[in-house]
Amino acid sequence: MDMTKTVEEKKTNGTDSVKGVFENSTIPKVPTGQEMGGDGSSTSKLKETLKVADQTPLSVDNGAKSKLDSSDRQVPGVADQTPLSVDNGAKSKLDSSDRQVPGPELKPNVKKSKKKRIQKPAQPSGPNDLKGGTKGSSQVGENVSENYTGISKEAAKQKQKTPKSVKMQSNLADKFKANDTRRSELINKFQQFVHETCLKSDFEYTGRQYFRARSNFFEMIKLASLYDKHLKECMARACTLERERLKRKLLLVRALKPAVDFLTGIISGVPGSGKSTIVRTLLKGEFPAVCALANPALMNDYSGIEGVYGLDDLLLSAVPITSDLLIIDEYTLAESAEILLLQRRLRASMVLLVGDVAQGKATTASSIEYLTLPVIYRSETTYRLGQETASLCSKQGNRMVSKGGRDTVIITDYDGETDETEKNIAFTVDTVRDVKDCGYDCALAIDVQGKEFDSVTLFLRNEDRKALADKHLRLVALSRHKSKLIIRADAEIRQAFLTGDIDLSSKASNSHRYSAKPDEDHSWFKAK
């Protein structure tokens, strides 16, 4: 049998493995049939030899390994029981429990583990499958990935994407916290500024602390329900224009919800002590404060200063205004519910009340004195009123010390003639009408609270005794002038007024009602 023919037959049958074997090896000389004894056994032995060579694993130079497709691939025939030969004498079969991947084969696996995602771990492949594809091998691959990244499976589960709603809540919480910090710093600085301003104006610090009110303070003291009921009762008997204004207030009471906690306190001073000067200084400072005037007639006194509004205009404004700092001038003219409602609408963190506690009247829940707020700074020294007026006011139960010059106080009969003054005032509507009938302009004392005039004439009649029982009104009427005060009074009431010996039998307190009955609510102020 010719060996060359046999090789050619193998080539034509496409057996590349035989080609690979004989290209780099020497073909041994096979004895002929005659040399082996003349029988045909040599041919059959040669075929068996070639068959075995065809199925024997191929050895490759330089220790290169052949690549197999998958872990399930097996070499048929003899190779099924023949161990794979690996360079450096490595074993081909390892136990699944303690099998280790050789150094040169671990590098590709580690590189691939860097690209793996914890959420979807990739199945081990490559060298792990080459060494049997056992379960132990896949576990080794997973452990390598976990140890390399330093993240356990439990930590990987917790490291999920945060929902948008949770992120939004977290962002809002951070904003609220930052806003609270900013607000606290602003209030502390403003308190220090108020303290310095009051001391420069010779106001005395009483040692009391600001009252800290909760955001729902309006509801806690039952004032919101009282005010709601009061507004509904007033709407039933009000005119069209007034009804619309009351309706808007009622809507605010029901719509505005608790916003922020706030601090509040009172700066109290006698007439002429410098309260208006303090308010102007605070408004001109570096702090963004808003001032609400309980008496809109004082608007001209604050001309050229930003942030000054009438209390009703600010409360019912169509344009929403917010401010951390709220100052209320002549607070005794404002209703307690209006102040708390204004604080809620402006979201103010501090409400500073400026006025004279002696000019207040705690008879019903509508009075701010009903809240019993602390007086933080006080002054009994007047720089505008002279000694004569200060002595007269002290007899009325309003103690004050004058550091001004001497002024003039003239007391005469109601009927007669006197020098004309800049302003004429009276306690009741009937007296105002009587003065106007004589050709003189006249105003109610309550309407000029907070205003100042160079000279004033005060008209008193016997019919005004009930109005004179109001200590608050007496102080207002006696302290509107700077240099001259003329008192024209009937003989029956003159002496009692000068000595303060007036029937002051006050009515019982009606703090359980927001508004008193008409006959208890100084109806003599208004025209009938």
Curated annotation (Swiss-Prot):
Cofactor or coenzyme needed: Mg(2+)
Residues noted as binding ATP in the record, renumbered to the chain: 269-276
Reactions that this protein is recorded to catalyse: ATP + H2O = ADP + phosphate + H(+)
GO cellular component, one term: host cytoskeleton
Keywords: ATP-binding, Helicase, Host cell junction, Host cytoplasm, Host cytoskeleton, Host nucleus, Hydrolase, Nucleotide-binding, Repeat, RNA-binding, Transport, Viral movement protein
Region Nuclear localization signal, annotated ranges: 243-254
Assigned EC number: 3.6.4.-
Ranges for region Nucleolar localization signal: 111-120
Region (Interaction with the suppressor of RNA silencing Gamma-B): 75-491
Subunit structure: Homooligomer. Interacts with movement protein TGB3. TGB1-TGB3-TGB2 complex formation is enhanced by ATP hydrolysis. Interacts with the suppressor of RNA silencing Gamma-B (via N-terminus).
Protein's name in the database: Movement protein TGB1
Natural source organism: Barley stripe mosaic virus (BSMV)
